[in-house]
Amino acid sequence: MSFDLIIKNGTVILENEARVVDIAVKGGKIAAIGQDLGDAKEVMDASGLVVSPGMVDAHTHISEPGRSHWEGYETGTRAAAKGGITTMIEMPLNQLPATVDRASIELKFDAAKGKLTIDAAQLGGLVSYNIDRLHELDEVGVVGFKCFVATCGDRGIDNDFRDVNDWQFFKGAQKLGELGQPVLVHCENALICDALGEEAKSEGRVTAHDYVASRPVFTEVEAIRRVLYLAKVAGCRLHICHISSPEGVEEVTRARQEGQDVTCESCPHYFVLDTDQFEEIGTLAKCSPPIRDLENQKGMWEKLFNGEIDCLVSDHSPCPPEMKAGNIMEAWGGIAGLQNCMDVMFDEAVQKRGMSLPMFGKLMATNAADIFGLQQKGRIAPGKDADFVFIQPNSSYVLTNDDLEYRHKVSPYVGRTIGARITKTILRGDVIYDIEQGFPVAPKGQFILKHQQ
């Protein structure tokens, strides 16, 4: 049998092992894994490289339509490809209108035409004003629904995203349980965080340490406990977004041990940055939940290695530079991290701390694909989409602004020495990024809809 592509001599991350083996691709799918696979139109030599499943980033904000001056499909998905991401799950907020019904998601599909370098699945929004329309998004094919129990959205814009109160969350979770859809939650206590923030600003406490103190760990833990119980009563599968504290992870672990259907994610910035670094970097490292102290970070690494965190995500949430101006308490909260999830975490988790390659593959790709039902993604296995990233270990570089593909070339990682490099990203058998050639093909990304897999 002749194949379209054979990748030879790489250390391939399989589900339960990593070994030097060849991969054959035909028609955009993985056709065979083994040795002496035969002939192919193209042969790639991956000697000395790690071949990982392409990252499935389950938490990405692309602000198009409506706020394309923040980030757009063209720049955002190119950055993703350069960073080894082959599939993103896009959040329903930051764009205008927010993705809360059939009409708004169709606008998003139109805005992305011809611009997707990678594949993209969609989340719908659960907001205060759309509980009677959740079924529309399910029918279109979203893979989950995101909501906030922390304050969010611009109250001066009618079609912006909105947080939910406990009653709205409960009613929405009941409906999503009936639809068989998971609810994803940003967990911070809205009233307490808002009050602590206002108190700090009124007293002139506007440093990074002050911001972190205004969103203490207990506000995350309380919100996690609350939504765990409400989702359990409502009969809805739950996913906790961007957990920032080991205490928060412990709540999820406890609920799982009691039989609840719950998963969780965290982000690289909670493992590689701390509050002192946040103070040095400034507003580019502001996010919520916030980047906490070094002791908290050590606890997060322990939870990650224990297998208590299901997946790692970027929570890429950029904005125009002027929204990052001024003091930390007033600046927009969101980190541009899409391009540096894979290389930073390979360096920090695998090279510096000894994480196994199969565990790395699960955290970056496999588990997210499983959680959100992306049946063709997340694994190097026969029959799956031929999505790969080539990683060059022990190859250090210093990240510069010019390296970034974002609309706004800023990131809290600029200036960081990263000890691994993404050298090639392959989507459904085609090279979409190469460290020497850049982006050699026209955008070929597709939207992944739940009911069309």
Swiss-Prot record:
Check the record and name the Pfam families matching this protein.
Amidohydro_1
The reaction(s) this protein catalyses = (S)-allantoin + H2O = allantoate + H(+)
Q: Which cofactor does it need?
A: Zn(2+)
Q: What Gene3D superfamilies does the database record attribute to this sequence?
A: Metal-dependent hydrolases, Urease, subunit C, domain 1
Q: Where do transmembrane segments lie in this chain?
A: none
* EC number(s) reported in the record: 3.5.2.5
N6-carboxylysine carried by residues = 146
The answer on whether this UniProt entry bears the keyword Zinc reads yes
Q: Show the SUPFAM superfamilies listed in the entry.
A: Composite domain of metallo-dependent hydrolases, Metallo-dependent hydrolases
Q: For this chain's UniProt record, which GO biological process terms are given? A: allantoin catabolic process; purine nucleobase catabolic process
Query: So, what pathway does this thing act in?
Result: Nitrogen metabolism; (S)-allantoin degradation; allantoate from (S)-allantoin: step 1/1
Listed GO MF terms = allantoinase activity; cobalt ion binding; zinc ion binding
Which UniProt keywords are present, listed alphabetically? Hydrolase, Metal-binding, Purine metabolism, Zinc
At which positions is Zn(2+) 1 bound? 59, 61, 146, 315
Leader sequence segment: none
Q: What does this protein do?
A: Catalyzes the conversion of allantoin (5-ureidohydantoin) to allantoic acid by hydrolytic cleavage of the five-member hydantoin ring.
Summarize subunit and interaction data from the UniProt record for this chain.
Answer: Homotetramer.
* Descriptive protein name: Allantoinase
Q: Which organism is it from?
A: Escherichia coli (strain ATCC 8739 / DSM 1576 / NBRC 3972 / NCIMB 8545 / WDCM 00012 / Crooks)
The taxonomy runs: Bacteria, Pseudomonadati, Pseudomonadota, Gammaproteobacteria, Enterobacterales
